[in-house]
Design a protein with these regions (language model features):
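RNA-contacting regions in translation and RNA-metabolism proteins
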Residues: 1-46, 56-81
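Glycine-centered tight-turn and secondary-structure capping sites
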Residues: 48-52
Length: 81
């Protein structure tokens, strides 16, 4: 598990009411790394935040952490199943 993925998972679990439903996957696509964050449908609004500010902050943190590892990170927040 990469450091970026761990950071995203820890932050998401801290922000949600259902931390056990948080799931994070990481995949490589050419020169980019895609991190998908799956959360409970009831928590999706908390992670997006007002006007998308929380989601934007999470994406910025993931991108910055990825730069330290030499990775181009894209973070997508999705409703889990």
């Amino acid at each position: 598990m990469s450091g970026v993925r761990e950071v995203v998972e820890v932050l998401a679990k801290a922000l949600t009411d259902r931390p056990n439903d948080v799931r994070v996957t990481e995949s490589q696509h050419k020169h980019k790394t895609l991190i998908e964050l799956f959360v409970s449908p009831s928590d999706i609004g908390k992670l997006i935040g007002r006007q998308g500010r929380t989601a934007a902050a999470l994406r910025t943190l993931a991108a910055t952490a990825g730069e330290r590892e030499g990775k181009d990170i894209t973070l997508e927040i999705r409703e889990g199943r």
